[in-house]
Amino acid sequence: AGIPKSRIEESAAKKQAAIDQGLEVIVGVNKYKPHQKEKVEILNVDNISVRNTQIDRLNHIKATRDNKLCKKKLKDLEDICRTGSGNILGSAVEAAKQRATLGEISASIENVFGRYKANSKTLSGVYKNAYENDEGFLKINKKVELFEQKEGRRPRILVIKLGQDGHDRGAKVIATAFADIGFDVDVGPLFQTPEEAAQDAIDNDVHIIGISSQAAAHKTLVPILIDSLKKLNGEEIVVVCGGVIPREDYDFLNKIGVKAIFGPGTNILDAANDLIDILLKK
């Protein structure tokens, strides 16, 4: 039923609402903020080079192993999965001993069992209850209603994670808050490719794609997403980013078409207000 997961997400949303309201104090974020931005040295890693190195290593392993024996062990693993007779873990270890890769081992198992697809659900009411009768909250609600009158439907946002970034707390909090503000919210599955996310955005007919980035892949994956949208005639979709993104990278993202970037400590109501303003000005 996913009850523990939903309780954790509800707790995170309540905590974030309290932080945004200043009820939960975080020194330097919502109270006693520094007057000047401190420049932080960033280690830039060429992830394209790292990826190519890993691919070269995998190709070397495949070229130097006993491929016939390796394929037999992978076939044995798949047969055990299909018949239920034997030890799956033991068979996977035997395949690994013959230098089968994790991808190949996973594929053998997936051929029988398929791949799990998580259902992403958004909570409702947490932010609405926290901001009951709040002027700022009501003001944004009015802007959402104005957009609905203008466009014939509510603003729709797709909140996504790209690549191997599995840190989804921030994305789930954003989805919960924006739903309470009045947006229609879709949440993409974890570990999507940029091409898959672009197709989802087109299929769901969204106005905004919100990319939550916590794993420093924004300079690699966001350009691919934007190129994919162009190929699908989705240039009208507003692309924004949030999360841990160095300020030095803001110009790069803006130049390729990202309309807004929200760093750590951003008040969610401020972000929602900025986004609805972008849509109303289009």
Task: Give a label for each model feature.
Residues 1-139, 202, 206-207:
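Flexible, glycine-rich loop/tail regions that form catalytic "lids" or insertion modules at the edges
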Residues 36-38, 98-104, 112-116, 164-168, ...:
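Flexible loop/turn segments at secondary-structure boundaries
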Residues 114, 152, 233-234:
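Residue-level recognition of short, structured coil/turn motifs
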Residues 134-153:
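Acidic, low-complexity intrinsically disordered tails
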Residues 155-157:
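Conserved hydrophobic helix-helix packing surfaces used for dimerization/oligomerization
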Residues 171-281:
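Cofactor-cradling patches in redox/metallo enzymes
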